[in-house]
Design a protein with these regions (language model features):
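Ribonuclease/tRNase effector modules and their secretory precursors
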Residues: 1-157
């Protein structure tokens, strides 16, 4: 049901360990598919990337890669990751590879309301790995300037 999607939770009411356990139960141990049939795999080590953020970035230092603070904002959207992946109305974009400074179809970025973003890495036919999820306050314009995702297999028919 659409009304059951995109509900916020009060993250401060739970411990980090609770969320880590829930991550394992709700994501790592489940078979999760995108709306278009891609199986997305989740791993324990994805938790930190998805739910920690950098204090340097909060202070406007955008070069920092360290993630040193658990984000209540990200945790409040804990279940949104599944919602985004399953949402056929999400805006889809080709992902950006910072190392090569180019767009790559091995990454897919899904954007939904309030600029919430989920990134997956496609590594085989109908298989992907979860990369991260966040509210794209500072990067949403850059994401939306990139190429739209087009399902090349669907268009090849």
């Amino acid at each position: 049901m659409a009304e059951d999607r995109y509900k916020l939770i009060v993250a401060k009411d739970y411990t980090e360990q609770y969320f880590r356990d829930m991550w394992n139960a709700a994501y790592c141990k489940q078979e999760i598919y995108t709306f278009d049939g891609i199986r997305v795999f989740f791993y324990d080590d994805n938790f930190d990337h998805a739910f920690y953020e950098s204090t340097d970035r909060r202070q406007g230092i955008h070069k920092s890669k360290k993630k040193d603070v658990l984000s209540m904002r990200r945790l409040s959207r804990f279940y949104w990751i599944k919602d985004v992946l399953r949402d056929p109305d999400a805006e889809l974009y080709v992902g950006y590879e910072s190392k090569s400074k180019s767009y790559t179809r091995s990454k897919r970025v899904a954007v939904v309301k309030n600029n919430y973003v989920v990134v997956i890495q496609i590594y085989a036919d109908k298989k992907a790995k979860f990369i991260t999820a966040y509210v794209a306050d500072n990067s949403i314009d850059k994401i939306k300037e990139g190429p739209k995702w087009v399902d090349t297999k669907k268009n090849a028919d």
